[in-house]
Amino acid sequence: MKKMISRRNFLAAAGVVAAAGVLTACGGSSNSTAASASTAASGAAASGDTIKVGVLGPLTGDVSVYGQAVVNGATLYLKQVNEKGGINGKQLEIIAMDEQGDATQAVTCFTKMCDQGITALVGDVTTTPTLAIAAESADYNMPMVTASATAEAVTYDAETDTVNENVFRATFTDPFQGIKMADYAYQKLGYTKAAVIFQKGADYNEGLAENFVNEFESLGGTIVDQETYSEGDVDYKTQLTTILGKAPEVVFCPNYYQEVGQILAQAESVGLAVPFLGGDGWDGLEGYATADQLKDAYFCANYAKGSNPDFEDAYKAEYGEEYPNGFAPLGYDAAMTVVYGIQAAEDAGLAAGDDDYKQAVIDAIAGGTIDGITGTFTFDEHHNPVKQTAILCFDGATPVLKEMF
């Protein structure tokens, strides 16, 4: 029988810079520990009264908006555990590092964290660095929970039918999102003709696009056009004009919010006045598109604003701003998942960091039920969370929950 971990009330916590010490790139100082944990446990580390947890993400660079949110959420939860007395009296020591959105830096960070004695990792954030760490982590059998990396290959190699036994995720996968949005477009919205525009060569974009196309066609729909662009492109008018000529009822645009804003504006300029759909990369779109451009648009996400007012109020009180996107609650849930596993290993009386300890963490997570900010979830045979998705529409230009689907 699977065990349940209850959602913890969100408590006041130190800001990320205060709570995680000096957050540096991996080439810098490796002394990136949580101030809260370090203060509580100064002089106690040698006695085994602390448990080291890595928290890794891009805190600088193009995708830092995601990394900062994940690290904020994770740090808040880990500090909360410490404020409640830790795990069986032991404090959590946070080893937090900035991988700058780079896969090579991510591996360097992970290796340094292992050298410092972490027992589990919350990270990474985006797909490509997470894939690199997942491959490296197997040699350490390091328990690893990514908050937000969506590529199927993070936890499962389809070519060899092999599960990455030590790796889990709190978010849903690229295939899941593509399939869900195809189902929603065809079954709930009634569209039968769709076009797709996405960045070629990008794991996230291609993963969503491929699964949307396959599912939409399997339901009886028609994909009238598929258009691609390259990384760094800023002019999409040629592709959008081609789509316009194919007369779709809806366009699936599985890209990140900065590009989505540009695509929506250019679609309006060429006269492509049909609804657009997207995945969780749209989270953060507010301010990048107008109400007219977002009319009848939908996207899927792990979390919808208003789902947990206590969480949102506490985040705003602590950081002086509203939570930036759905990556913050995912970071919180990823940390909760890691702590669930650590609790089981500690209850078994194992020595933190040894092979049996890490395996106990992995086994507990695989069989656990997490009651998180993004909903209650278990893990399937590929270590993906089993949960509903939030479908968001727009009130003007503000995303709001339409329904759970």
Set out the residue ranges of the language-model regions.
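C-terminal motif of bacterial Sec signal peptides marking the signal peptidase cleavage site
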Residues: L23-A25
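Extracytosolic ligand-binding ectodomains
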Residues: K2-L11, G27-F405
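Bacterial N-terminal signal peptides
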Residues: G15-G21
